[in-house]
Amino acid sequence: MRLGPRPAVLGLLLLLLLYAAVAGASKAEELHYPQGEHRADYDRETLLGVQEDVDEYVKLGHEEQQRRLQSIIKKIDSDSDGFLTENELSQWIQMSFKHYAMQEAKQQFVEYDKNSDGTVTWDEYNVQMYDRVIDFDENTALDDTEEESFRQLHLKDKKRFEKANQDSGPGLNLEEFIAFEHPEEVDYMTEFVIQEALEEHDKNGDGFVSLEEFLGDYRRDPTANEDPEWILVEKDRFVNDYDKDSDGRLDPQELLSWVVPNNQGIAQEEALHLIDEMDLNSDKKLSEEEILENQDLFLTSEATDYGRQLHDDYFYHDEL
């Protein structure tokens, strides 16, 4: 028997879903710069991962740390000129983000695949997420605002699940599950992501998202002289980050840069931070000597996922 969600838990479920949807980039920035101050150990955690990995890194001898770090440096140096540029560091950090996202999805796949048959069904996904199978009528709105919001989110998840299922089998295989969890990483999900965003934000159905639609339900207080700070920030993002052709609206490709989590900015910021801190001769790039001289800083950065890469032979295994 399929059940709807228990009303008592709807509020909590909704909050959790909303938090998960928006927390990625802002959470990374908050952890990196709490109260606006740079946190040095954030870099190591990004490179190494969880505290257990950091502890394991500390156990490595100094020579072994250097050996593995030198191997990583060679891999980052894509043109083999002996220096790490902003672009090389940024590309490496983005690759690291993607690698660990894929690793996490693989771990989740095992947890969701309750009967260990190599696929995750929609029912298994529901059981893992909500401890029961939830099924909503697509055509019947709910009176309660929170319940209706949850229904909409749940139906969107179901549509994404169905889109990820390329072979129309009873469930998702690993590759399809990754597409479901990280549609931004899979080409065949791009059109779905854009369409989903247009359905949510394009209120007049013209195929674009205007500034007004971008800001949602915001209306300026008639007694206020100016917009609040957060609105000014959002307007600036619309104009300078997303509306590339400056036509006052977001086309589908511009919309994609808004709705899909984008690690490029975070990676570029970290690359610039490392060069700024470690570039001893001000040539805007890092030599192996500069990195080894500032080894602790480099191993507390996203470039090595806070040192985590020293324990993952996907990154450090190479001939020196």
UniProtKB/Swiss-Prot annotation:
Modified residues (Phosphothreonine): T140
SUPFAM superfamilies: EF-hand (SSF47473)
GO cellular component: endoplasmic reticulum; endoplasmic reticulum lumen
A Pfam entry, by short name: EF-hand_7
Positions contributing to Ca(2+) 5 binding: D243, D245, D247, R249, E254
Tissue and organ expression note: Ubiquitous.
Superkingdom, taxonomy of origin: Eukaryota
Free-text function comment from the UniProt entry: Not known. Binds calcium.
Similarity comment: Belongs to the CREC family.
Protein name, as recorded: Reticulocalbin-2
